[in-house]
Curated annotation (Swiss-Prot):
This is Gene 34 protein. Residues 95-126 are annotated as: Disordered. InterPro entries: Herpes_UL95. Pfam families: Herpes_UL95 (PF03038). The gene is 34. Residues 106-116 have a biased composition (Acidic residues). It comes from the Viruses.
Length: 347
């Protein structure tokens, strides 16, 4: 063995010493636990340490599984999610995937109803769950401001490009953007809204991160716009209950037509919380301190948001995936102070 080690290491003393030490340790393991480790010399002048991690089968030779064993209650969430992803990917590769903003085909509806291709019933798969919602500096600062004119102008500039209109059922997005950012239901309805207590009016609803950056992905913005508006307002225009007519800068008839077309859009289970970012962070602070319970994604303020972090960090174990999710807490008073200083908001 030692002559072989010298030849293999080409005279490298350090490598030769490591080779000898490794083989010696392997031999010692095999001698100590002969039923678990085996050392095999390969034809290419090396050694292979094989470990037996399978339990010994000590059942009687004539034994057999109990008849009528029922394992239908055993669930493996990770394998179920993997199967759902494979099925979705197979559907898109076969040309069955719906375009952005359009209703999916019959095969996708069958999958949503919980019926596989073979016809056997199965449980519907829940949508993928993320433990964290990360908002970069640009996004969470826009989420705090009531004035969303810059977001609308940015979206209109991107939608002026024909390439961003591919695969969408929307023809007039401006009424939808106005509803989502300035409609009567687009503000926090928490009776103890901290934003209202500070500035005299409720804060804007917290939307997904990509809704504040239309220039980065106009297609995602347009698809998210359809889902969010349908979640908050439905598909019928409520007139004065939806908007303040005196503030709308275009013909009110465009609202009815734009909302009517949302009936052909698959909302994909979209849900918009009826709280602003400040109230969401306040609830997260209570969860991090263990004052209240709850579930859902944890909001993370990226970029300059790290200066608002406090020392309290809560944890929660996901019963479905087994992961540990963190709930950071934030100094809400400091966030509102900086917002007031930058935007000049007053009660």
């Amino acid at each position: 063995m030692f002559a072989l080690a010298s030849m293999t290491t080409s005279g490298d003393e350090a490598l030769n010493a490591r080779y000898k030490e490794s083989v010696s340790l392997s031999v010692g393991l095999c001698e100590s636990l002969p039923e678990q480790f085996k050392l095999i010399e390969t034809p290419i002048n090396s050694f292979l340490l094989v470990a037996n991690v399978m339990p010994n089968d000590d059942r009687p030779w004539d034994s057999h599984p109990a008849s009528g064993a029922d394992f239908h209650n055993i669930r493996m969430p990770r394998l179920e999610r993997l199967r759902a992803l494979i099925r979705c990917d197979r559907g898109y590769n076969n040309g069955k995937g719906g375009e952005a903003g359009q209703r999916a085909g019959e095969d996708d509806e069958r999958m949503d109803e919980g019926v596989p291709e073979e016809g056997a019933p199965r449980s519907p798969h829940p949508p993928p769950f993320a433990h964290y919602e990360v908002y970069d500096s640009w996004s969470w600062q826009r989420a705090l401001r009531v004035d969303k004119d810059d977001v609308i102008r940015e979206a209109v500039a991107e939608l002026a490009k024909p390439a961003n209109w591919q695969g969408t059922a929307v023809e007039d997005p401006l009424p939808l953007m106005w509803l989502l950012f300035y409609g009567r239901r687009s503000f926090c309805d928490d009776p103890e809204c901290l934003y209202r207590a500070r500035f005299g009016h409720p804060g804007p609803l917290l939307l997904p991160n990509y809704m504040y950056r239309p220039a980065e992905d106009a297609s995602s913005f347009l698809a998210g716009l359809c889902r969010c508006v349908r979640s908050v307002y439905g598909c019928e225009f409520g007139g004065g209950s939806h908007v303040n007519p005196a503030q709308v800068p275009f013909d009110h008839g465009r609202f009815s037509e734009a909302l009517r077309k949302l009936g052909a859009v698959d909302d994909a289970g979209a849900y918009v919380s009826r709280q602003c970012l400040v109230c969401r962070l306040y609830r997260q602070n209570l969860m991090s301190r263990g004052i209240i319970g709850g579930r859902g994604s944890s909001i993370v303020l990226g970029g300059s948001g790290k200066k608002y972090l406090t020392r309290e960090v809560g944890t929660r174990r996901c019963l479905e995936l087994g992961d540990i999710a963190l709930y950071p807490s934030y100094d809400i008073s400091l966030i509102l102070d900086d917002l007031e200083a930058s935007d000049g908001l007053r009660q």
